[in-house]
C-alpha cells in the first residue's frame, strides 16, 4: 500500500513544490527536466530511464529552502536552537498517550515543555554512529532513541544505505547526479570497473551494488591513491559548461575539500554511510504504531526517522526526497485533522524534572 501511495502521489508532490517556487531545471521546451539516477530502470533493469526531477545537484537543499520560505511567508514560528530531549507520555484510561515534548534551549540552558494535541517526529537519521558519513553532526538518532526509550518499537534498523560516492576519507556526499550526467567510476588502472559488475546499467546500478563493487575493487588491490583505498569518479570527459550548470556543488566540494579540479582530474571517492531505511514504524497516514494493529493517538513520524516500509533494504536514489514530501504531507494533514477534535492530554507538573 505504501509503495503504491508513493508512486501515485509523486506527481502531485513535484507540482506542489513547483507551485511553492522550487527552481527545477528545465528542458528547452520549459518542462521540468529529468535525469538518470542509480537503479532507475525499465523492464526490470534492462535500461536506465530519466525519472528524477532535479535542481542542479542540490535538489534536497532547494526543497529545504523552498519549504522554509513558505513557512516564513505563512508566519510559522520556529524555536531555533531548542533541542528536544524527551517525549512526555501521560497515562489516560490505562494507556500511555503523548502530551508534550521537553526541549533544551541551547542559549540559556533552560528546559521548556511544549504541549501539543498532535506531535510529529521529523528528526532525521543517525549517520553519525558511523565513522564516515554524509550526514550532519546533529544526526545522532535522538528522535529514534526517544521513541525507543518510551517502550515503542523500531523497525528495519539493520538496513542502512551506504552511498557510493563520498569524498574519500571525509564522507562528504558527491551527488549521484554526477553519474546521472555521465560520470564514470574507474579503478587505479583507469578501468571502468562497473562494466564487470553491472554490464547493462554500469555506473547507474543500484547503490548497494555500486558500493559493494567499489569496496571489492579496493579489497582486491585495484584501489587508487598511495594507500590504494579509494576509486575515482571521472568527469573529465564532460564539457565544463555541463559540469558548471548541472553539478556546481560537486565541483565546489572537490576543489574545496580535496584540492581536485574536476575539469581535468578524477575525484577520489569511497562509500559513505548515508541513509537509514528503518526507524519509527508508521502506517500510511504517518501515525506511529504501537504494534502491527494499534496506533499511538496524536503521535506521528515522517522522513528518515520514520519507517513506512516503502524502501525495503536499499532505497533508490531520490526516493527519499519523494518519501519525505509524500508522507510528510500526509503526516501534516493527519496531525491537523486529529488536533481539530482532540483535547489536550494533561502534562505532569514535573515533566521537565523527569528528563
Placement of each model-derived feature along the sequence:
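Glycine-rich loop(s) and the adjacent beta-strand/alpha-helix scaffold that form part
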Residues: 118-172, 317-334
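An anion/pyrophosphate-binding glycine-rich loop and adjacent beta-alpha core
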Residues: 146, 152-268, 334-340
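Short FAD-binding loop at a beta-strand-to-alpha-helix junction that anchors the flavin cofactor
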Residues: 118-124, 285-287, 291-316
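Conserved mixed alpha/beta core segments that line enzyme active sites in large multi-domain catalysts
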Residues: 69, 77-129, 158-160, 249-250, ...
